A protein has these predicted regions:
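Class I S-adenosyl-L-methionine
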Residues: 9-14, 69-78, 85-237
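Class I SAM-dependent methyltransferase "Motif I" SAM/SAH-binding loop
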Residues: 21-27
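Conserved SAM-binding motif I beta-strand of class I
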Residues: 40-45
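Short alpha-helix immediately C-terminal to the canonical SAM-binding loop
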Residues: 49-52
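Extreme N-terminal starter segment of soluble prokaryotic enzymes
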Residues: 15-19
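Conserved SAM-binding strand-loop segment of SAM-dependent methyltransferases
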Residues: 59-66
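Catalytic phosphate/metal-binding cores of nucleic-acid and nucleotide-processing enzymes, i.e., regions
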Residues: 144, 232, 244, 249, ...
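Gly/Ala-rich phosphate-binding loop of Rossmann-like dinucleotide-binding domains
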Residues: 34
Length: 259
């Protein structure tokens, strides 16, 4: 059995946290929050197909469409979001965080300033580390947020594919209080030590690609079936809900230690 199975689901609730999701896709972060008994009060997703899925799975969640038109959606303890990575990833043009798509970080940052959540959870391509991550960290620091980050592969959680993503958890030092933060007991390390992952650190895993030649015809997506194209795009861009669940459990564990 994989060490990650069943993490944190049986932990006692102290105070129920609330979650809001930006660039929601098909709800990977929402599912991860749900695994930890954290309700998602609102989400924001511009693509019609993805919003249809979100409405089916989370019918009670307030839904917004365009983040550029979103303003003060209501307080939540955690805001999550994977702003578009097309300008950042290896497959993109490498324009970085100032590109037309990945530049939507500015909108996410605006919502963070307006809402002032206790925690922020960010997902993106690992290439962000060399294509604008310092901008993200500086912006968060200017409004009082400390941050930690890790590159995590799906394979670490027992999935048969690599898909490494960068995850960053930031926390508001004004709400938490700097005197309560013990840097030797950080969000990630307190959890990773308990699972004995490479001495308390996530590591890159070796191995071949999940995709094989058998999938080549299917992945071309040239059959003209619109639903399948949208479905593949949504799945390809989705946050792994198991990884998301682990990250939310890290936040809950950290928050409980501050009580």
């Amino acid at each position: 059995m994989n060490d990650y199975q069943g993490f944190a689901y049986n932990k006692k609730e102290r105070n129920q946290m609330r979650h809001g999701s930006l660039f929601s896709g098909i709800g990977g972060f929402e599912l991860g929050a749900q695994m930890n008994n954290i309700p998602t009060l609102w989400n924001c997703e511009i693509e019609d197909f993805q919003r249809t899925i979100l409405k089916q799975v989370f019918p009670d969640t307030k839904q917004y469409e365009d983040i550029k038109e979103l303003s003060k959606p209501g307080y939540v303890d955690i805001i999550s979001g994977g702003f578009p990575c097309q300008d950042i990833s290896i497959a993109g043009k490498g324009e970085g965080i100032t590109g037309s798509r990945s530049g939507l970080w500015n909108e996410m940052f605006r919502i963070i300033r307006e809402v002032r959540p206790k925690y922020v959870l960010i997902e993106n391509s690992p290439m962000l580390l060399i294509r604008g991550f310092e901008r993200v960290l500086c912006d968060l620091s200017q409004i009082g947020y400390n941050a930690e980050w890790k590159c995590i592969q799906n394979k670490v959680f027992g999935f048969p594919h690599n898909r490494e993503r960068l995850y960053c958890i930031a926390y508001d030092s004004h709400q938490i209080g700097r005197e309560k933060i013990h840097y030797e007991d950080t969000i990630f390390n307190s959890e990773s030590r308990s699972f004995e992952i490479q001495g308390g650190k996530f590591s890159r895993m070796s191995g071949g690609s999940f995709w094989s030649e058998d999938y080549s015809e299917f992945l071309r997506m040239d059959d003209g079936i619109s639903y399948n194209v949208h479905r593949l795009e949504a799945i390809g861009n989705a946050v792994n809900p198991v990884v998301a669940g682990f990250l939310f459990s890290c936040i809950k564990e950290f928050d409980n230690q501050l009580a």
